[in-house]
Structure formats: C-alpha cells, structure tokens
UniProtKB/Swiss-Prot annotation:
Family to which the UniProt record says this protein belongs: Belongs to the RNA 3'-terminal cyclase family. Type 1 subfamily.
Subcellular compartments: Cytoplasm
Chief location of this protein within or outside the cell: cytoplasm
GO biological process: RNA processing
Protein name, as recorded: RNA 3'-terminal phosphate cyclase
HAMAP family: RTC
Catalytic activity: a 3'-end 3'-phospho-ribonucleotide-RNA + ATP = a 3'-end 2',3'-cyclophospho-ribonucleotide-RNA + AMP + diphosphate
Primary gene name: rtcA
Keyword tRNA processing belongs to the record: no
Function: Catalyzes the conversion of 3'-phosphate to a 2',3'-cyclic phosphodiester at the end of RNA. The mechanism of action of the enzyme occurs in 3 steps: (A) adenylation of the enzyme by ATP; (B) transfer of adenylate to an RNA-N3'P to produce RNA-N3'PP5'A; (C) and attack of the adjacent 2'-hydroxyl on the 3'-phosphorus in the diester linkage to produce the cyclic end product. The biological role of this enzyme is unknown but it is likely to function in some aspects of cellular RNA processing.
C-alpha cells in the first residue's frame, strides 16, 4: 500500500485529489495521513470528502476514515464501473469543478454519465466556464473528447449548480504543447445569476477595454440566468492561439464592482500570455496528470507549489520518468517506461 504524508508540500486538498485519481486509474491502494495538517481547520472537510465519495462510487472502493475531520484515510479501489450513471450531490457550494478534475482522467473510455450538483463558480477553484473554454479544449487538443452540459449555476454560499459530464473518450499519446502560437482571438463568457443583467455587460466591457490592445478579435458572450438558487457573477476568458489556449477567470463578490471583475480576469490573462508559455498557470497544474499518464511535454506559465506536490504523488503511483526545467515559464516532460 502506498503511504502518503498529507502535510507534504502545499499540504492541501490537491494531495488527496491527485492520489484518488491515480489510485482509481492504477488500482493501487493508498493510505494518507496528516491530512491538511498545516491548515487552520485540519483533516478532511466536506468538499474533500465528496471527492473521496465520488471516486469511491466509480471504483467500488473500500475506505476507512472517510468522515469530516478525519486526518487519515485508507482507500482501496476495485474495478471502475463502466457503462454507468452516477449522481453526486455535494450540497451547498462545494466545488463541482474540483470534483470534475479528480474524476475526468479516471473515466476516459469508461462510457459513464456523471451528474454533479454543488458550486460551479466558487472561490479557490476554476469556474465552470474556465473548464469549458480552456480545460476541455486543451484536452481536445491532446486527444481527449468530452461533453459537459451546464444545467444550473451555483455560487457561494448556497450552491445549487448542476453539471453533467459524459462521453469522455480518447487515446492520447506523447503529445506536445510547447507554444501558444500566433494569437488568433479572445473568447469569453461573462455571467450573472439572479442579479441584474447590466453586471454581466459591465464585466465584459471592462475586460474588452484592457484586452483591446492585443489587437485581435474579441468575442465575449453574456450568460444571464434569473431564478437560480444562488446569486453571483463572474467572467472567464480564453486566448486562442494557433497551437494552444491560455485562460483566466474572476468572480464577483459583495462590494466588488463589476468593472474590477472584468479587469482582474483580463490582467490575469495578459500576465499569463507574457510568460510565453503554452498553457496558463492553472492548466499547468492540471495537465501534469495527463502528461504523466500518456507521455508528452508542455511549457506551463509557472511552477506552483501545487505542481511540485502533484509531481511527488505522480512518482508514487506511476512508473514514469519526469524531467522539469525552469520556473516561469517551466517545461514538463514525462516518458512512460
């Protein structure tokens, strides 16, 4: 059984999520201890528990310690349940997108349909529009197709969002994402839920004002939804290059003007573009698992503490040679033995 110190590196939920993903894919059981030991509220929190339960559902896993506050977890996966329909209700505004990140690598070619309820646009996790505009499109570039339907949006603290994931298929091998290539255009989605529509327009206009200096076509659509359970707003942007995609997002919050939300996302996007990387700082972390599973290389915007943590967990589960160089940007290469 693989032993993992949960206080290693950044010591957060990323260690657990990466371990769950790779455990289900490889069939290797693990025990993680000192879970979130260095955090103000140590142990498993509700959002982490749902990642455990989601992966338990798809792999018929045996678990010990899967309860709120637990500082130790044993996870023993069995065969993945293909050709199945799974419903996951995180409750309130637990992050749907973090659950998606954990599950998607494990359900490739498994003919599964997964419905997740919770928070689609919440702090400290990618927004659902970033997932749709950037994450899924990068996966498509490396050879993984999928269908993701956003049924309802969910914001903090009420949640109420709903997403359906299905038809995750592909057979990527030894891919290469080393540059963005010529910048073609900027795409985006500016949204509001149960708030005035002008907020979405102001977010969009603010972002466009900053991005106009890039000299390319800008297409930011607005998504206005009234009658949702939770109130909120946000914007996600994607810089479409000839060879890759760079993304950024920002969420509204009480007291934060719509113009600031749009400006924040636009400046994040430009900051990532200035690194001359092929993928942005968030995708740099998320692409590491796929590269290690299928072989390949990419240039990411910045080597974060999450990335270091991911690398160490990957080495515990996979027989793979990892080469890494640089910091901002950095190059990650994985060769499968």
């Amino acid at each position: 059984m693989i032993e993992i110190d949960g206080s290693f590196g950044e010591g957060g939920g990323q260690i657990l999520r990466t371990s769950l993903t790779l455990s289900v894919i490889t069939g290797k059981p693990f025990r993680i201890f000192n879970i979130r030991a260095n955090r103000p509220n140590p142990g498993l929190q509700r959002q982490h528990l749902w990642a455990v339960r989601a992966m338990k559902m798809i792999s018929n896993a045996e678990t010990k310690g899967d309860e709120v506050g637990s500082k130790e977890l044993t996870f023993i996966p069995h065969e993945i349940k293909g050709n199945s329909i799974i419903d996951i209700d995180i409750g309130t505004a637990g992050s749907v997108t973090l659950i998606m990140q954990t599950m998607i690598p494990a359900i490739i070619n498994k003919n599964m349909r997964i419905k997740i309820k919770g928070g689609t646009d919440v702090p400290k996790s990618p927004t659902i529009d970033y997932i749709r505009l950037v994450y899924l499109e990068i996966l498509r570039k490396i050879g993984i197709e999928s269908k993701v339907n956003l049924i309802k949006r969910g914001h903090y603290p009420e949640g109420g969002g709903e997403v359906i994931i299905e038809n995750v298929n592909g057979n990527p091998s030894d891919f290469s994402l080393l540059e963005l290539g010529k910048l073609i255009m900027i795409k985006g989605i500016s949204h509001v839920s149960s708030l005035p529509s002008h907020i979405a327009e102001r977010q969009k206009d603010s972002a466009k004002a900053i991005l106009s200096k890039l000299g390319v076509q800008i297409e930011i659509e607005t998504d206005v939804r009234q009658g949702e359970v939770s109130k909120g707003s946000g914007i996600a942007l994607a810089a479409i290059g000839e060879k890759s995609i760079i993304g950024a997002d920002s969420l509204g919050e009480r007291g934060k003007r719509a113009e600031i939300v749009g400006e924040e996302a636009a400046r994040k996007l430009i900051d990532n573009l200035n690194t001359k990387a092929a993928v942005d700082v968030h995708m740099s972390d998320m692409l590491m698992i796929f590269t290690s599973l299928f072989g390949g290389e990419y240039i990411g915007a910045e080597l974060t503490s999450h990335a270091y943590t991911n690398m160490e967990i990957i080495r515990k589960f996979l027989d793979v040679k990892i080469e890494i160089s640089g910091k901002r940007p950095f190059r990650f290469k994985a060769k499968i033995f």
